[in-house]
Curated annotation (Swiss-Prot):
It catalyses: an N-(acyl)-sphingosylphosphocholine = an N-(acyl)-sphingosyl-1,3-cyclic phosphate + choline; an N-(acyl)-sphingosylphosphoethanolamine = an N-(acyl)-sphingosyl-1,3-cyclic phosphate + ethanolamine; a 1-acyl-sn-glycero-3-phosphocholine = a 1-acyl-sn-glycero-2,3-cyclic phosphate + choline; a 1-acyl-sn-glycero-3-phosphoethanolamine = a 1-acyl-sn-glycero-2,3-cyclic phosphate + ethanolamine. Binds 1 Mg(2+) ion per subunit. It comes from Loxosceles hirsuta. The lineage of its organism: Eukaryota, Metazoa, Ecdysozoa, Arthropoda, Chelicerata. Mg(2+) binds at residues 22, 24, 82. Its EC number is 4.6.1.-. Its cofactor is Mg(2+). Gene3D superfamilies: Phosphatidylinositol (PI) phosphodiesterase. Disulfide bonds join 42-48, 44-187. InterPro entries: PLC-like_Pdiesterase_TIM-brl. Belongs to the arthropod phospholipase D family. Class II subfamily. This is Dermonecrotic toxin LhSicTox-alphaIA2aiii. Keywords: Cytolysis, Dermonecrotic toxin, Disulfide bond, Hemolysis, Lipid degradation, Lipid metabolism, Lyase, Magnesium, Metal-binding, Secreted, Toxin.
Amino acid sequence: GHMVNAIYQIDEFANLGANSIETDVSFDDNANPEYTYHGIPCDCGRSCLKWENYNDFLKGLRSATTPGNSKYQSKLILVVFDLKTGSLYDNQASEAGKKLAKNLLKHYWNNGNNGGRAYIVLSIPDLNHYPLIKGFTDTLKQEGHPELLEKVGYDFSGNDAVGDVAKAYKKAGVSGHVWQSDGITNCLLRGLTRVKEAVANRDSGNGYINKVYYWTVDKRATTRDALDAGVDGVMTNYPDVIADVMNEAAYKNKVRLATYEDSPWVTFKK
């Protein structure tokens, strides 16, 4: 589910069939995660202005992903944080990672004490901001919770050349837990050339990519094209449309929604 920035939308998208949501994170001048907010412009047909304070959103998300909680949504298993680091200077990336880790540890993971169970993908728009990853991972280790890194994956969302993305991960010291996004706003069309390149890297056996997702997919035809190209996931404003296509004869025996028992970091072998 794309652009889930208000707490009530967590339920809304999960009830439409989403097993994963994407949430925008904006930062203040000191690299603190501040709001879950996208702003104008955004996808056609959507309100761009929904928001929460980031820490409040994390608490709402924790409720939705903690078994036994009255707000628990059992099929919600993955959250992509679309980190709007474009407002920061490059030299603030590491600091943003540190602060993100502390916020998640306290408000989402409940300091490691029966917090939310969803897997988290940190999605970074700029390859130059790769130090955010080390800031994040080092902080979780320093805070005594390296085990939570098992729950965390990474994505560079700038549609950069696949080779350049690989280099950024090398600099960040990341091997594994890598999702590769490709896409564009639903207001515009984008072909599947780079998606196919990413899928080939994933399936090569020696590439850096574990999973590939395509965004924003709102139409049945685009959903079919993406599934045919071999993606692991799609981001959509209409989870019910995706569910309909997955139930079509051509797909219902080939693809299914991932559950909590499926690892988001292990490349699926056909």
